[in-house]
Amino acid sequence: METVDSTRAFVKNVKRLIVKVGTAVVTRADGRLALGRLGALCEQLQELNSQGYEVILVTSGAVGVGRQRLRYRKLLNSSFLDLQKPQTELDGKACAAVGQNGLMALYDSLFSQLDVTSAQLLVTDNDFRDPDFRRQLNDTVNSLLSLKVIPIFNENDAISTRRAPYEDSSGIFWDNDSLAALLALELKADLLVLLSDVDGLYSGPPRDPDSKLIYTYIKEIHERVITFGDKSRVGRGGMTAKVKAAMYAAYAGIPVVITSGFATDNIIKVLHGERIGTLFHCDANKWASIGETDAREMAVAARACSRRLQALSSQERSKILQDIADALEANEKAILAENEADVVAAQQAGYEKSLISRLALNPGKISSLANSVRVLSNMDEPLGHTLKRTEIADGFILEKSSSPLGVVLIIFESRPDALVQIASLAVRSGNGLMLKGGKEAKRSNAILHKVITSAIPVSVGERLIGLVTSREEIPELLKLDDVIDLVIPRGSNKLVSQIKASTKIPVLGHADGICHVYVDKSADMDMAKRITVDAKIDYPAACNAMETLLVHKDLAQNGGLNDLIVELQTKGVSLYGGPKASSLLMIPEARTFRHEYSSLACTVEVVEDVYAAIDHIHQHGSAHTDSIITEDQEVAEVFLRQVDSAAVFHNASTRFSDGFRFGLGAEVGISTGRIHARGPVGVEGLLTTKWLARGSGQIVDGDKSIVYSHKDLTQQG
């Protein structure tokens, strides 16, 4: 999910960048060159080079490559007796001399395949003591870059006079990380990217599940909490060296990002402003507030609060919902004022009318929302409901009971009223909740969240419902499959598809709302006109609005189709036809049947009969809601049984496919999936089950001492 992080906005001004790739990225575990990773690296640099970026590469790996080659050569020249003797470590300078040739030959070959010219520059720390060298270095690099050549730097370890330890008071640079930082200053780079074998800087060893990736390094916050693990299998300094080099460059005014070199497109993502890796920036200390509450901490807090909520009685949970309803009505003016500000901003930004329609809270909406919350508070208790009760054996009773899911993440667009519905359902079902609304409803969501959480008692905690305000946090949230139990995306096809592709957490929702109304030849035409008009114009932007009108072929001959068309056009509906309807009605042909207009427009097509209508729905629909209008009960039953959608209606508008209208009190969304919940999802869709066994000392012991009865006691319970 591509997005520009607010702290990465500086990338739009990047012209010259230095990319440093470490030995752990350049080589495989066996010491051989990692051809796949190097190929991906060169492809990224070629793409940037072609886009006008000035790209400089600093590479490690020569010593590692040389060591592997010399070990192989030594093995070939050793007798069996030689191999039994203790093996001495190969001289690093000799390894560097041998490996440099092979490493650069590979870079030259890869870049040549991409029509890019590269140049090798070997340097030592002593070189930088000479001002003339530094001036000449700048001249040479500037000349190469003007010719779109990619300079490749490496420390000339073969002739370096520096000895271990690599860092000392007299050194100018100590490894290729510090060389890259030094070059960034000398060559006036706009960005330094350090590629590692991990995703960035973690609060602890990356393999520790409690370690968290730090997206923006703030020295005052992170210096005292970070624990470094072992360095990589190769290379000199590991993450410690990278952090020191990054801080050196960042405090000199050059942003640095440490990220993984194992991914095939991380450099491109960095330059797109995506929130990957760890950013070091001279202004990072001003961004302490951007640290927000960590996504994991928010989810963990929501779970802790949900367990306290579950411990309350049914009456106490109902009282919370009643307090929320009262708070909504008491703050109606403030809510509507913030919503109006969102609507005005959306209009000025040029948003589509359908989005603005979903965004606006009309007069009376707050009262309606409050009433729906009260209805929910008066519904039967959903938790701890015994679904099945079985006597396993004498004195051994097993119950299947309803239980909360845990923590639910809802990502929704445009509609602030959805926040109220979702939050009230979470309270009723005993779940913790994480909410991420669209930026277009930022003010509305903030005030609604504040009003609702203020009504939650301290004994439960207002962190029961967390509001995520930054879009950049979504990728991090979607990684939390150990603390978030379900994701429900409510929005566009693109949003839902991206969410499903980006997480291991179960996802419940629908990608499209392509709803059909089929008017059969035996339909009551007055009823048909009322239903089709309502299904389209009652709320055109809703996911349960009609998007395709299917009409039996006989109605095209007896005037019924024309009556429907006139009725829709009179209401301002734009019509687009399928191949048959467009020629019959002289209307524009629809580009595709799989199109969700979300506005006063729909597709019309003529079909042979109910079976053709069913086939059309299965081929082009989204399994959301479909309706038939007919007086023929047999045809109606065929449609109801055979249409494989979450909701199938007879002689009713598709707009009834709604949690409130179904009597669910409210809904968190509509699911077109076939697992867990389907159709409008109310309280029951946020529940799972647990097994409760009450015994009297029973043991298995090979089933020798127990007599199973398996008696159903559900009705007796």
UniProtKB/Swiss-Prot annotation:
Coiled-coil annotated residue ranges, if any: none
Positions of ATP binding: 196-197, 236-242
Catalysed reaction equations from the record: L-glutamate + ATP = L-glutamyl 5-phosphate + ADP; L-glutamate 5-semialdehyde + phosphate + NADP(+) = L-glutamyl 5-phosphate + NADPH + H(+)
PROSITE patterns given in the database record: GLUTAMATE_5_KINASE (PS00902), PROA (PS01223)
Keywords from the UniProt entry: Amino-acid biosynthesis, ATP-binding, Kinase, Multifunctional enzyme, NADP, Nucleotide-binding, Oxidoreductase, Proline biosynthesis, Transferase
Region (Glutamate 5-kinase): 1-296
CDD domains: AAK_P5CS_ProBA (cd04256), ALDH_F18-19_ProA-GPR (cd07079)
EC number: 2.7.2.11, 1.2.1.41
Any one GO molecular function term: ATP binding
One term under GO cellular component: cytoplasm
NADP is among the record's keywords: yes
Regulation: Feedback regulated by proline.
Superkingdom as given in the UniProt entry: Eukaryota
InterPro entries per the UniProt record, alphabetical: AceGlu_kinase-like_sf, Ald_DH/histidinol_DH, Ald_DH_C, Ald_DH_N, Aldehyde_DH_dom, Asp/Glu/Uridylate_kinase, G-glutamylP_reductase_CS, G5K_ProBA
Tissue: Expressed at high levels in leaves and is inducible in roots subjected to salt stress.
Similarity section: In the N-terminal section; belongs to the glutamate 5-kinase family. In the C-terminal section; belongs to the gamma-glutamyl phosphate reductase family.
Function: P5CS plays a key role in proline biosynthesis, leading to osmoregulation in plants.
Name of this protein: Delta-1-pyrroline-5-carboxylate synthase
Species of origin: Solanum lycopersicum (Tomato)
Gene: PRO2
